[in-house]
Every structure is written in C-alpha cells, then in structure tokens.
Amino acid sequence: MKEKNILFFFSFLINYLDNLSKNFCFRDYISFELNLLAETGYKLDLTKCCVSHVTTDLTYVSPKSARALSYKVGKPYRDKLLILPKFLLAKDSEITLEEKKQALTLTNYFFNRYLFHNNRQVKAREEFIEYITNI
C-alpha cells in the first residue's frame, strides 16, 4: 500500500508541475522533500558539523547519521559522503544545475534508504527527477 501511495504521489507531482513549470521553485521543492523526510522520522541535520560542531564551511552529509560535516572533517572521507548543496545554507544564492543534482542525490539517497527500503527506485520518481532538473 505504501508503495502505491508513493507511486501516486510522484505521478501526481509530475502532472502538477507540468502545469506549473513557469512558477516552479526548486528551493521550495527540495525544502518539501526534506520536510517529508523529517515527517517520516528521517530528519537531516544540516545546521552544524556533527563532529566539530562548527556552523561554517559545511560541505558534506554523512549517509549514516544524516548530519552535516565541515569540509575539513569530511575531506578524508569525501568519497563516502554526500555533497551538501550550498543553496541549502545560503538562502539567497542562485541554484546551479550541479546543485540541483546534488540536492536530488541527497534526498534521493534517504528516500531510497528509508522510504523505498532499498527497493528499486520508483519509476515515476526517476521521471520526476529528470523533469525538474530540466526546468
């Protein structure tokens, strides 16, 4: 039942965004995905480094703890970490295509791990990701 709801959700979202493509706000959508993860019990903590507790130069997210890491702390492990897109920290910055992809990789990792339970990604979500990275 849960998988059918997820399939419906992303199918609906594709159709909805098709009508709103001129007004689509990527920042708001990623915020929605992060809030959806939080509401289902998987909140990402992007406010400070989980090791040094600094709030500056946050660059990575640990896939194990879902918490941010500073560049200095994360650099030796960067191949095992997710990238924290800068626009999630700097609210007024322009969002590049690369940052869009980083943000979707970040949320997609946690969707696949916790909501889709490492099953094959929902096809509708794949189509949705392709769509919004081209807006």
UniProtKB/Swiss-Prot annotation:
SUPFAM superfamilies: ArfGap/RecO-like zinc finger. Signal peptide: none annotated. It comes from the Bacteria. Transmembrane segments: none annotated. Disulfide bonds: none annotated. Gene3D superfamilies: Recombination protein O, C-terminal domain (1.20.1440.120). InterPro entries: ARFGAP/RecO, RecO, RecO_C. It holds the Pfam family RecO_C. One of its GO terms (biological process) is DNA recombination. This is Uncharacterized protein RP549. It comes from Rickettsia prowazekii (strain Madrid E).
